[in-house]
Amino acid sequence: MEKESKRKPRILCLHGYRESAEILKKLILRWPESVTGKLDLVFLDAPFPAKGKSRLEGFFDPPYFEWFRFNKAAILCAAIPGMQREGVALKKVPKIKFVILISGAKFGGPSFGVPKLAINAFSSPINCPSLHFLGEKDYQKKDGEVLLECFVDPQVIYHPKGHAIPELDDSSAEIMLGFIEKTFPNFVTGADQYNWKPKAKL
């Protein structure tokens, strides 16, 4: 009976600028099965065909897509929990339970303006489990560091690469597995709710 109630947490995976669901899937599935096997990953193409060249041409076949004509899906994803809290987005669906942000940034941070709907998204700390990937050589690293300050108890995986989806070494996989186990304990037992309690700051 207990086996029947177990399910993997479902994660909506949104690709980057001028990429595609298929490209993101190939990159994420390079991660260890010990990580990906614990998750129900759903990959979607953005609604707009990309204009201009993709940086991935020659590595992955087209077509390529864009999300709302701006750089990264992670920027939007970072703002959604705060936008839900303010009652301006996704009002008819359950609250976002967590975010995993690769090369994320903040609307209103050093490099990005603020759309009207997101103006108060970061007006107070976002109490939503978050895991952030920051690349040492990422041109957007400063934006990612600013974003960390917007979340209560953000978890971080640092990697030596640039603006890219990194492979997970043993240390990164351990952090990722820790985040999954901490964030999704009730998901994997079939409970409808989970209680997020940030750990005490050291």
Can you describe what each PLM-predicted range is?
Residues 72-114:
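Primarily recognizes the serine-hydrolase "nucleophile elbow" in alpha/beta-hydrolase
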Residues 169-202:
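Catalytic active-site module of serine/aspartate enzymes centered on a nucleophile-bearing elbow/loop
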Residues 144-145, 149-166:
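Catalytic histidine neighborhood in serine/cysteine hydrolases
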Residues 107-109, 134-141, 163-164:
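Acidic catalytic loop of the alpha/beta-hydrolase fold
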Residues 2-4, 8-71:
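Serine-hydrolase catalytic machinery in alpha/beta-hydrolase-like enzymes
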Residues 125-126, 130-134:
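Short beta-strand/loop motif that positions the catalytic acidic residue
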Residues 50, 162-175:
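Catalytic histidine-centered segment of alpha/beta-hydrolase-like enzymes
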Residues 26-28, 113-118, 140-149:
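Short alpha-helix in the alpha/beta-hydrolase fold that links the catalytic acid
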